[in-house]
Amino acid sequence: MPTIQQLIRTERKRLTRKTKSPALRSCPERRGVCTRVYTSTPKKPNSALRKVARVRLTSGFEVTAYIPGIGHNLQEHSVVLLRGGRVKDLPGVRYHIIRGTLDTAGVKDRRQSRSKYGAKVPK
């Protein structure tokens, strides 16, 4: 506990919050170009081949982003839209690619949670 005299001398420091997605620079989404599309293996208890892409953003950052859903059409030089949101079992992956925008196609034959995967209404 500081004394009143200490508080007069120097005021209390404000706590600064560290952002969880610095590459977005306070924007909800960011556009970028894929520099590499590959698969990655998750952390210890899980086992899979998760689809990820290295993306160079318009803000100048180069980040790793997760490609959600089953199957994708992304390749090098594809223009994608990124949102925040980490993948818990992939270290260093703090962003998600938004399906159904720009060069990213929506998930085919998706019936539930369609809006999250850019899928149109099934006939």
Curated annotation (Swiss-Prot):
Q: Which InterPro entries match?
A: NA-bd_OB-fold (IPR012340), Ribosomal_uS12 (IPR006032), Ribosomal_uS12_bac (IPR005679)
Residue numbers of 3-methylthioaspartic acid PTMs: 89
Coiled coil (residue ranges):
none
What is the protein's species of origin? Answer: Prochlorococcus marinus (strain MIT 9211)
What family does the entry list? Answer: Belongs to the universal ribosomal protein uS12 family.
Spell out the molecular function terms from Gene Ontology. Answer: rRNA binding; structural constituent of ribosome; tRNA binding
**What is this protein called in UniProt?**
Small ribosomal subunit protein uS12
Kindly list the biological process annotations in GO that this record carries: translation
Give a Pfam family name: Ribosom_S12_S23
Subunit composition? Part of the 30S ribosomal subunit. Contacts proteins S8 and S17. May interact with IF1 in the 30S initiation complex.
Q: What does this protein do?
A: With S4 and S5 plays an important role in translational accuracy.
> Which controlled-vocabulary keywords does the entry list?
Methylation, Ribonucleoprotein, Ribosomal protein, RNA-binding, rRNA-binding, tRNA-binding
Xref: SUPFAM superfamilies: Nucleic acid-binding proteins
Tell me where on the tree of life, at the top rank, the source sits: Bacteria
**One GO CC annotation, please?**
small ribosomal subunit
